[in-house]
Structure formats: structure tokens, C-alpha cells
């Protein structure tokens, strides 16, 4: 929509962790310019006061209250809002901007009947569900080209779907009885203070949560094509997701070598996927838009094991959103996105 060489973008809900990560990545993006950042709870505050790490790029930027008129003519808007908060504003934004990318859950599930079951409320604009493409480029890239609406995947579904999808699409595993155990850093719980995410609660602790009820379960099933038993865990770290997926091969002769070769071939042209024999670590993906994968077949028990690691705030949220925006807006997919993690 813009004739400016740099695409003009905005963020609704920029004061949370995913919003701050969007700001960091856009600040280093050579073809995007952030022109408005809303954060109703921080309206009137300088970005640098809440996130000193963003001072060099946003020295004078102030969070504003949401006003739809501020987004007139923008090339894209990213929504970093809580569950159910994007639905009331999307129709209006579609009239104003080139592409709406929702980092929340409001448009990920295609069946509106799933929302009251998993999110406790009816979907208020079910007619718009089909306007949103599911934003996992490695699986749905062609659908993202020129998309007006993008439902950016959740962090757990990103890690699980990228691990399982190659085997499902190749017809190599049973699609029932799949197990996904995944651990996330505490940033996945958001910036708001909660008793179970304080330093004292998280440090030197490791626990499962959302037993049988986690909202990412139907999303993982929708994207991977598997029936899954999903158990998330909270790990004593800030960033990262490590997902361990278990499935039964359909062919008893399927081997570790076969599994690794399948992953390598499936993702051979993917700039953000690393397949290796080495067991992935979350630290290796810190700050990067990459996913590290490996696989093993246990001949003794007959189980296929697939492990994936990613940064929940980058590939699992804001980096994935930028990747989708690049595709939807006709830019090179990798523009502005880091592929190397921070070590040590």
C-alpha cells in the first residue's frame, strides 16, 4: 500500500513480551518501519522506560492507547493481544491496512465450535476465520503469499507441528496415540505478574501444567493431523521450548537413518530449519528464528522419537510473525531475521 521503500507497520499490544520482541526485530529490519505501538496499560510511557534494551531504536517512541485511525494506510499491523481481544477490532483493521497478523489465538482454529470448548467463549466473528491463513511457512507457504490475514501459530504448536508434519505427510506414522511432551521458558506466560511465574516459584523448579486441558492441544492436532496427548511443562529458564514427540511408525523396519533422512529431505530448502543427529538444545536457538530438529527410532520399544527446540518469543511468536509478513508483503522471507543463536 505504501510507496515508501520501507513498509510502514504498527503493533497493537506492544508492551508485552511478544510486542517487545516484534519491536526488536522490526528495529533491525531494513525494509520495515514501526510507526505506531499501542499498549493501553502503558499508554503515555516511553518504550525505553519499560524496555531499556530498545532504547537505541526507539529513543522517543511512546506507547499510545489503541485508536484505529492511527493505522490508516499501513502496510501491516501485528496484534499482540490476549485471547479473544483481537476479534472486536479485526473487521475495522481489514479496511485500513494491507495485512493483519494476529499473534494471539483468535483465528488459529478453523472450527468455531472449538472456541467455547477450549477458550470458554463463542467466537464473535466466525465469518472471518476463513480470512486468516495459518502462519507456518514451512507447511503453508503458498497460502501466505498476498494474504490479508495471518493467524500466527502458538509456540508449542510450532515446535510440535514442525516435528510431526513430515512424518504424517509421508505416511510414516500412526496418527493416533501421539504424545507431545514440551517444556517452555517462563516468558511464555507473558509479562503480567502471576504467583506461579515469580522468580521464587520458577527458580530450581520444573513442573507440568494444563494437564489434558491446554489450549494448544486442538491447534497441534489441526496442524499436524495427529490425535495428541499434550503435556506442557514450565522450565526454570526465560526463553525456549523443547518438545519431545513420540509416535508409532507404520513400518517396523523404519529406522533412525530413515527418520533423519526424511527430515533432511522435507526441510532441505528451509532457511530456518536445522536437522542434525545432535540432540537439540534451547540455548542454541536463543534469539534466532530457527528450529533445531532430530529424530530416533527405538528398536527395542518400536517408538519414533522427534525432538525440536526453538526460541518461544522468536520462531514461536514474533520472528514467525515477521517471517509471515515478509512472505505476505512480497519481501524476501529471511529479511531481518537472525538465524544464529546467542552463545554462551
Across the structure, where does each feature detected by a protein language model lie?
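Conserved active-site and cofactor/substrate-binding residues in soluble primary-metabolism enzymes
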Residues: 17, 131, 155-162, 211-218, ...
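Short glycine-rich or small-residue beta-strand-to-loop segments that form or flank ligand, phosphate
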Residues: 8-11, 151, 244-246, 306-309
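C-terminal active-site/capping subdomain that shapes the small-molecule cofactor and substrate pocket
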Residues: 246-344
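C-terminal substrate-binding/catalytic lobe of Rossmann-fold NAD(P)-dependent dehydrogenases
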Residues: 198, 212-279
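Short, solvent-exposed beta-strand edge segments and adjacent coil->beta transition regions
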Residues: 147, 206, 240-244, 303-305
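Alpha-helical scaffold segments in soluble metabolic enzymes
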Residues: 21, 25, 162-166, 219-223, ...
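N-terminal Rossmann-like NAD(P) cofactor-binding subdomain of oxidoreductases
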Residues: 2-202, 207-209, 296-299, 334, ...
Amino acid at each position: 500500500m505504501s510507496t515508501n521503500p520501507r513498509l510502514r507497520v504498527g503493533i497493537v499490544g506492544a508492551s508485552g513480551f511478544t510486542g517487545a520482541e516484534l519491536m526488536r526485530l522490526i528495529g533491525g529490519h531494513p525494509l520495515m518501519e514501526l510507526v505506531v505501538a499501542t499498549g493501553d496499560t502503558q499508554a503515555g510511557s516511553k518504550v525505553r522506560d519499560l524496555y531499556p534494551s530498545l532504547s537505541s531504536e526507539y529513543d522517543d517512541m511512546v506507547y499510545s492507547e489503541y485508536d484505529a485511525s492511527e493505522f490508516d494506510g499501513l502496510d501491516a499491523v501485528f496484534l499482540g493481544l490476549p485471547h479473544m481481544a483481537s476479534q472486536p477490532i479485526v473487521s475495522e483493521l481489514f479496511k485500513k491496512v494491507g495485512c493483519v497478523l494476529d499473534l494471539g489465538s483468535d483465528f488459529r482454529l478453523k472450527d468455531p465450535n472449538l472456541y467455547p470448548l477450549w477458550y470458554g467463549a463463542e467466537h464473535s466473528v466466525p465469518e472471518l476465520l476463513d480470512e486468516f491463513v495459518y502462519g507456518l511457512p514451512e507447511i503453508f507457504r503458498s497460502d501466505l503469499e498476498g494474504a490479508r490475514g495471518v493467524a500466527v501459530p502458538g509456540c508449542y504448536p510450532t515446535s510440535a507441528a514442525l516435528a510431526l508434519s513430515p512424518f504424517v505427510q509421508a505416511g510414516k506414522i500412526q496418527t493416533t496415540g501421539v504424545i507431545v511432551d514440551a517444556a517452555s521458558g517462563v516468558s511464555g506466560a507473558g509479562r503480567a505478574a502471576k504467583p506461579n511465574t515469580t522468580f521464587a516459584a520458577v527458580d530450581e523448579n520444573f513442573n507440568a501444567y494444563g494437564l489434558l486441558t491446554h489450549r494448544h492441544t486442538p491447534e497441534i492436532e489441526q496442524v499436524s493431523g495427529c490425535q495428541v496427548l499434550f503435556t506442557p511443562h514450565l522450565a526454570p529458564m526465560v526463553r525456549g521450548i523443547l518438545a519431545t514427540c513420540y509416535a508409532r511408525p507404520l513400518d517396523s523396519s523404519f529406522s533412525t537413518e530413515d527418520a533423519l533422512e526424511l527430515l533432511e529431505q522435507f526441510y532441505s530448502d528451509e532457511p530456518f530449519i536445522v536437522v542434525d543427529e545432535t540432540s537439540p538444545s534451547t540455548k542454541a536457538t536463543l534469539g534466532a528464528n530457527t528450529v533445531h530438529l532430530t529424530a530416533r527410532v527405538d528398536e527395542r520399544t518400536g517408538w519414533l522419537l522427534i525432538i525440536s527446540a526453538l526460541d518461544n518469543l522468536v520462531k514461536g511468536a514474533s520472528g514467525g510473525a515477521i517471517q509471515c509478513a515478509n512472505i505476505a508483503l512480497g519481501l524476501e522471507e529471511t529479511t531481518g531475521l537472525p538465524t544464529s543463536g546467542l552463545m554462551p
